[in-house]
A protein has these predicted regions:
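Cap/lid and interdomain-hinge subdomains that line or gate substrate/regulatory clefts
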Residues: 1-98, 102-105
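A near-ubiquitous, low-amplitude feature marking generic local secondary-structure context
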Residues: 28-31, 48, 109, 121, ...
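Hydrophobic alpha-helical scaffolding
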Residues: 17, 51-55, 84-87, 109-116, ...
């Protein structure tokens, strides 16, 4: 019937009762795949700014993505982000988030709530935005003047996205939506999904310098 209806399907052959490890492994794989599909269907992906200039493989067909994965794309400008931050006035929430930041990061020279206050405000703003827009994935790239509010925002992106990744929201740099989706898939099927880049490799000393890119 599935064949005649044109529905894609798979058949698992084996014995469930008695603990057939092969059957159990196949069932678990299909369950993980279903979890990924459900996560894509039940959340949205956001793109802030535009993809990194010159990297044309980063652009995607939003219509095709929705038709295949039921994943809806929401486009945002950076002005939206600092506008949200301007509306954050709950000092108790900011203070609690500042303490969470201090508990999460090792800050060179020592950190205080006062030192990370602005950072905490932006993290609270980003968390509110993720909740309001029902986001599971974010791809961003800032290519503007790092002055005024824009400069403050630019300096807050890595810690803000790091905190979101910690909470399970996939955040990719360079506006790479495909990497954001890959991070989300890894988070769903294996418990964590991180983004890193190899900046330099010393073959003589067998050293590889890896940047965390927000994770």
């Amino acid at each position: 019937d599935l064949e005649r209806a044109g529905k894609r399907h798979a058949v698992i052959t084996g014995v469930v009762e008695g603990g057939d490890p092969g059957v159990q492994a196949e069932i678990e794989d299909w369950c993980k795949a279903a979890q990924v599909r459900r996560r894509f269907r039940d959340t949205n992906i956001a793109q802030i700014g535009r993809p990194y200039p010159g990297m044309m493989d980063l652009y995607i067909d939003e219509t095709n993505l929705y038709n295949r994965m039921f994943l809806y794309t929401k486009q945002f400008d950076w002005e939206k982000m600092w506008a949200i931050a301007d509306d954050i006035t709950d000092e108790d929430a900011i203070r609690a988030k500042a303490q969470e930041i201090l508990d999460t990061f090792d800050i060179e020279g020592g950190g205080t709530i006062e030192k990370v206050w602005d950072m905490a405000k932006y993290v609270v703003a980003f968390e509110k935005w993720v909740k309001d827009e029902h986001l599971g994935m974010i791809a961003s790239h800032y290519n503007g003047f790092a002055q005024g509010k824009a400069g403050v925002l630019d300096s807050m992106l890595i810690p803000a996205f790091s905190m979101l990744i910690k909470q399970g929201t996939a955040c990719a740099v360079e506006g790479d939506m495909k990497v954001a989706m890959a991070m989300s898939i890894l988070k769903t099927i294996s418990g964590t999904g991180q983004l890193s880049e190899m900046y330099s490799i010393d073959f003589n000393d067998d050293i590889c310098i890896i940047g965390h890119s927000g994770s």
